[in-house]
């Protein structure tokens, strides 16, 4: 099962993420958990989130880039749900062997992330990749949709279909276990 942990603080203003979820939602074996819809008060049901993660084979953290990072509710979700003794540490094996993919949208182009002497966009994934690896997960190449503020509808739809195809490809590669 593919579990999408979706964190958009302003989903009503989303163009790219909305289309990505619409495409992903057409697939069987995909569960979407919209954190800002489920937890507008930021009071996360840790047991429910851990149960959802336990059902998943592939976990996707999907969100718009905010200040070169994840939205605040997704960070809080990580802090609460990926707990010691469950996700990592002594007896923390619940996520071991599962896969994690980062699906992120940005308003700027990929070159926008060439900051100083750093090599650009891939550097921004490092904390998320480190989190996945620390929890014993397999890190998959991220899915990034850039320039979403200036994309026309046709481009957004094409990118959302590309996202859907990534999920289909993963499902087909893992259908036998």
Curated annotation (Swiss-Prot):
Membrane topology label: Peripheral membrane protein
Enzyme class label: oxidoreductase
GO cellular component: plasma membrane
UniProt record, GO biological process: positive regulation of potassium ion transmembrane transport; potassium ion transport
Binding site for FMN: 8, 14-17, 65-68, 105-108
Keyword annotations from UniProtKB, A to Z: Cell inner membrane, Cell membrane, Flavoprotein, FMN, Membrane, NAD, Oxidoreductase
Residues forming coiled coils: none
Domain of life of the native organism: Bacteria
EC number: 1.6.5.2
KW Cell membrane (keyword) present: yes
Cell location: Cell inner membrane
Keyword Zinc among record annotations: no
Cofactor list: FMN
GO molecular function, one term: NADH:ubiquinone reductase (non-electrogenic) activity
Main location: membrane
Pfam families linked: Flavodoxin_2 (PF02525)
Catalysed reactions, as listed in the record: a quinone + NADH + H(+) = a quinol + NAD(+); a quinone + NADPH + H(+) = a quinol + NADP(+)
Family statement: Belongs to the NAD(P)H dehydrogenase (quinone) family. KefF subfamily.
Described purpose of this protein according to its UniProt entry: Regulatory subunit of a potassium efflux system that confers protection against electrophiles. Required for full activity of KefC. Shows redox enzymatic activity, but this enzymatic activity is not required for activation of KefC.
Subunit structure of this chain's protein: Homodimer. Interacts with KefC.
Protein name: Glutathione-regulated potassium-efflux system ancillary protein KefF
